[in-house]
Amino acid sequence: METTATSTHEFSDATRVLTSVLAPLEKRTLLWLAARMPRAINSDHLTALALAAMAMAGLSYWWARYSPFGLAAVIVCLAINWFGDSLDGTIARVRQHQRPRYGFYVDHVVDMFGIAFLVGGMGVSGYMHPFVALGLLATYFMLSAEIYL
């Protein structure tokens, strides 16, 4: 006898709460950027940019093992990640192209891969012991599972 479970829970939109000192400035900046972003660029493009920037940040940490310019490259990559990761949801809301479940899922999956690239790069950089990086990554994943679920 086969039974199917049905969920009685409704998916509700999450309210984005910015609480940092720079939150008002960040919100105004993101809205300004979203209003001026070319129509050909959508939220998926910005999400991909954010992931690529995190991968490059990880590679830049590896490069820092051989050259101090790698650390400067990490900073640039993290700024590009902020641009893509913060602006993807903003542009979707401004253009009324929200996909709450899909967007929530993709955002968090991309964040998981991004942090793996970043912390992996730290672990091979020589600036952090690989076991410390592994512990940091495991802790991040456990805390993320607690928060997202």
Locate the predicted segments by residue.
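The feature captures the transmembrane alpha-helix scaffold of multi-pass secondary transporters
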Residues: 68-75, 101, 130-134
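Acidic (Asp/Glu-rich) catalytic motifs at the cytosolic membrane interface
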Residues: 76-120, 146
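A generic membrane alpha-helix/interface feature
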Residues: 60-62, 68, 103-106, 125, ...
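A feature for the membrane-embedded catalytic helix bundles of lipid/isoprenoid biosynthetic enzymes
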Residues: 1-37, 108-149
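Topogenic membrane-insertion module of multi-pass membrane proteins
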Residues: 1-79
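Structural signature of transmembrane alpha-helix termini at the membrane-water interface
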Residues: 56-66, 85-87, 120-124, 142, ...
